[in-house]
Amino acid sequence: MYPYILFVLLFVLNACGNVPPDSYTAPRSPEVVARGAHLVKGLAACGFCHGVSSAPTSPLAGGRQVYDLYGAVESPNITPSKSGIGLFSDQQIEQSIRGIWKDAADKRSPTIHRGHEWLSSSDALAINAYLRSLTPINHVVKERRIGFASRNSTGLFSAAATVTGHVADTNPHDKIPYGKYLVNHVARCGSCHTTEASVFSSERYLAGGKIIRVNTQQYVAPPLVGTAQTMNTWSEPAIIEFFKAGKRPDGMQVKSEACPVTFYRQASDEEVTAMMLYLRSLS
């Protein structure tokens, strides 16, 4: 009798735990939408690629040329129109934020959202809620195809993790861990500033050297750690000044087309302080 009851219980629990992935509906409360807006216009800097122009207030209709592992590509429309994300389920939007594409494995780099794979579930759902709240813009963006040879010979050392389960929040009151979360998974500083692995060397965290292409210009991402002049050695006010004003200690203004400093200015004082404390904790 008891084995039979146990079997039934396991069957019911398994059935309840395997709800069709597209069936859940993300929260849409004003508080959740506001959190999403804060992230999209701030540290997550979605408009840096998806905006009609690279500005926090620009419509997110895509179409601007950006670069990934395979070269030039037009950024997708992420407004809730049929030509954007309007036909996506909530789960598909969350997965796209994490770099798991709905049906476009042959169109985009698997690392274009690298870092966001560990975005907390609540933050991913907040971004989803905000994007859903936007005015739909019907703007069809040309899709790119990547050939078999390129897909299987490019970026062999740049694979991103695939995260499909729940990702817990990081407590904002734990300043250094929260700063680490913001640096790595919201602002994704490593997507530009981490040295990529190669046949002869392993990846080096925030060590710089990556070529950033913007239109006809090229920039080399500087290291954030590793020398006596890198950001982790700056004073607390200097790091805060960088995030709030886009200015380095030497007075040089950071180019907003190469780094999303105009988005970083929207970050809260608490977020900037946490990031500063984390960066200063690095040796």
Predicted regions span which residues?
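Ligand-binding pocket scaffold of soluble enzyme catalytic domains
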Residues: 127, 131-134, 138, 236, ...
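Extended amphipathic alpha-helical interaction segments
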Residues: 148, 163-171, 181, 191-201
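Sec-dependent signal peptide recognition
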Residues: 1-8
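C-terminal motif of bacterial Sec signal peptides marking the signal peptidase cleavage site
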Residues: 14-15
